[in-house]
A protein has these predicted regions:
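Short, structured coil segments at secondary-structure junctions
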Residues: 35, 77, 134-135
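Residues that scaffold the ATP/ADP-binding catalytic core of kinase and kinase-like folds
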Residues: 17-18, 30, 52, 92-95, ...
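Nucleotide phosphate-binding site architecture
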Residues: 15-16, 47-50, 133, 139
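Acidic, PIN/NYN-like endoribonuclease modules and their adjacent C-terminal/linker elements
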Residues: 1-3, 114-143
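General small-molecule cofactor/ligand-binding pocket signal
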Residues: 40, 82, 139
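Active-site neighborhoods of divalent-metal-dependent phosphate/nucleic-acid chemistry enzymes
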Residues: 2-6, 51-57, 75-123
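Short, well-structured N-terminal submotif of metal-dependent ribonuclease cores
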Residues: 1-44, 54-71, 130
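Generic structural signal for small/hydrophobic residues in well-ordered secondary structure
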Residues: 11-12, 27, 49, 92, ...
């Protein structure tokens, strides 16, 4: 059944899972059961994916991933790719501060993803639940 109420932000690991030779069945089942119009990406994930592609040697795999990143993802998520704006920047500061105060530092990119999810009231879909252990709604379809 399609979830008509919640909206979601995909962590980079959720996006990159799609192009693995054998993607996680739990994540794929969740994606198929979720209304894709309620699923969003952050420019942060696009940056992390670009970095990963740039590190690959020239060849068919890199060419295929470049096409996926430059053409397929932007088309699939048209109007659902979220930028870093003033609200996200302010939420980022709160996120990093909360994690530091709790003795649980968070990486810069993860903090931007958490801040984007908080700002837009989205559930963050990730395999790395311990990276986002403080306030926020998390979903791990891998488990």
């Amino acid at each position: 059944m399609k979830d008509r109420f919640a909206s979601f932000l995909l962590d980079t690991n959720a996006v990159s899972e799609w192009v693995k030779p054998r993607p996680n069945p739990g994540l794929i089942a969740w994606m198929e059961a979720t209304d894709e119009d309620r699923v969003f990406l952050s420019v942060i994930s696009l940056a992390e994916l670009r970095y990963g592609v740039e590190r690959l040697p020239a060849g068919r795999r890199r060419t295929r991933l470049e096409q996926w990143l430059e053409q397929e993802l932007p088309l699939r998520f048209e109007n659902r790719i979220l930028p870093i704006d003033l609200s996200v920047a302010e939420a980022w500061g709160r996120t990093v501060s909360r994690h530091e105060a709790a003795g649980r530092p968070i990486g810069v990119m993860d903090a931007f993803l958490a801040a984007t999810a908080e700002t837009h009231r989205l559930t963050l879909v990730t395999r790395n639940v311990t990276d986002f252990a403080l306030p926020g709604t998390i979903l791990n379809p891998w488990s």
